[in-house]
A protein has these predicted regions:
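Active-site neighborhoods of divalent-metal-dependent phosphate/nucleic-acid chemistry enzymes
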Residues: 67-113
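Short active-site oxyanion
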Residues: 30-35, 63-65, 102-107
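Short, well-structured N-terminal submotif of metal-dependent ribonuclease cores
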Residues: 1-37, 48-57, 122-123, 130-138
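Amphipathic alpha-helical interface surfaces
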Residues: 20-24, 41, 51-55, 73-77, ...
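Helix-adjacent hinge/juxtasegments
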Residues: 54-72
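Acidic, PIN/NYN-like endoribonuclease modules and their adjacent C-terminal/linker elements
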Residues: 104-139
Length: 139
């Protein structure tokens, strides 16, 4: 599966008490190539997990690959921020929308189904997403 990793997947994978941990482990077992992501997602995940070394180890171990240079996409990120200002997207979400535009054959793996069902790549295209089955509220 060619995919892009959002923060929630990384946090769930790294936190055994997260309600989505089993789902995240199943995803990790099924991947055959590194999941693409961006620095904004990694910063969020490191914050939530309280472990920069752990998040960096996912890159070193080949589970994740940084595939985005924000400086090259500032104009598009600003357009996306303006378009979705009513949803108050964080920088990571904007970067993932842009990653989905750059890598159109990749699926975004996220626990944020509500927002990613609304976000569009290339202004009109639905972003393919993979979310956990609907389950209890996150811890």
């Amino acid at each position: 599966m060619r995919a892009i990793a959002d923060t929630g997947l990384i946090v769930a994978f790294g936190n055994r008490t997260d309600c989505f941990h089993p789902w995240a482990v199943d995803i990790a077992k099924s991947i055959t190539e590194p999941l693409l992501t961006c620095e904004a997602v990694l910063a969020e995940a490191a914050f939530h997990l309280r472990s920069v070394p752990y998040v960096l180890s996912l890159i070193e171990d080949g589970m994740l690959r940084i595939a985005f240079e924000m400086a090259k996409h500032q104009q598009r990120l600003a357009q996306l921020a303006q378009r979705y200002q009513d949803r108050h997207p964080d920088l990571a979400d904007l970067c993932l929308i842009r990653l989905s535009e750059i890598f159109p054959h990749h699926t975004v793996i996220t626990v944020d189904e509500e927002n990613f069902r609304i976000y569009r790549r290339n202004n009109r295209e639905t972003i393919p997403i993979l979310c956990p089955p609907r389950s209890p509220a996150r811890h």
